[in-house]
Amino acid sequence: MSRYRGPRLPIIRRLGELPGFSKKIDRNHTPPGQHGWKKKASDQKKSKESQYGIRLKEKQKLRYNYGINERQLINYVREARRRKGSTGEVLLQLLEMRLDNIIYRLGFAPTIPAARQLINHGHINVNNKNINIPSYICKINDIISVLKNSQQLIKNYLQNGGISELSTCLNLNKEKLEASINNIIPRDLVKLEINELLVIEYYSRKL
């Protein structure tokens, strides 16, 4: 399954708030579809999702929020299984430490897709090397910086709001537009409401 590039509100209506995917919020809590307003969530008490459907929904939330395709997510699950610790938590750590997510968390872009564009277009350096791979996994003590001829673009966004709260795992110099990674982003700082164990269960019989 390729990366999604269509309208975002129907996805948010189906999966709930996805902070990395879009700033949009479904204030009416209506399901997707032309007549979704007739089928508000409060009127669907009789509708019960299957266990498979619940796990699928959690998996989709991860995919859309972090902007990854099915093959990428499978690879992350496999890598999480190989590492020490809770597989679900390690999976979230891998996704949170992607360069596109770090750029988003620093407030350099409003969403992860927007952060990915900055990286793809060569605006970002890691340890003084230009990195144009959004899936690059950042490490502790990495230094993230913005190319000089690209800094005004980022400063304009920061002046218009930027990020409301910077993770304690990141240290940002707003004047230089340079940041250091102090620690791995832990589970309790993940913004997405997700049950990662259900994602691991979803793949338990597929991998």
Curated annotation (Swiss-Prot):
Localization per Swiss-Prot or TrEMBL: Plastid
InterPro entries: Ribosomal_uS4, Ribosomal_uS4_bac-type, Ribosomal_uS4_CS, Ribosomal_uS4_N, S4_RNA-bd, S4_RNA-bd_sf
GO biological process annotation, one example: ribosomal small subunit biogenesis
Disordered: region residues: 20-52
UniProt cross-references to SMART domains, sorted A to Z: Ribosomal_S4, S4
Any GO CC annotation of this UniProt entry: small ribosomal subunit
UniProt feature, compositional bias: Basic and acidic residues: 40-52
Pfam families: Ribosomal_S4 (PF00163), S4 (PF01479)
GO molecular function: rRNA binding; structural constituent of ribosome
Location of the S4 RNA-binding domain: 97-158
UniProtKB keywords: Plastid, Ribonucleoprotein, Ribosomal protein, RNA-binding, rRNA-binding
Role of this protein: One of the primary rRNA binding proteins, it binds directly to 16S rRNA where it nucleates assembly of the body of the 30S subunit.
PANTHER family given in the database record: 30S 40S RIBOSOMAL PROTEIN (PTHR11831), SMALL RIBOSOMAL SUBUNIT PROTEIN US4M (PTHR11831:SF4)
UniProt family annotation: Belongs to the universal ribosomal protein uS4 family.
UniProt subunit comment: Part of the 30S ribosomal subunit. Contacts protein S5. The interaction surface between S4 and S5 is involved in control of translational fidelity.
HAMAP family xref list: Ribosomal_uS4_B (MF_01306_B)
Protein name: Small ribosomal subunit protein uS4c
UniProt gene name: rps4
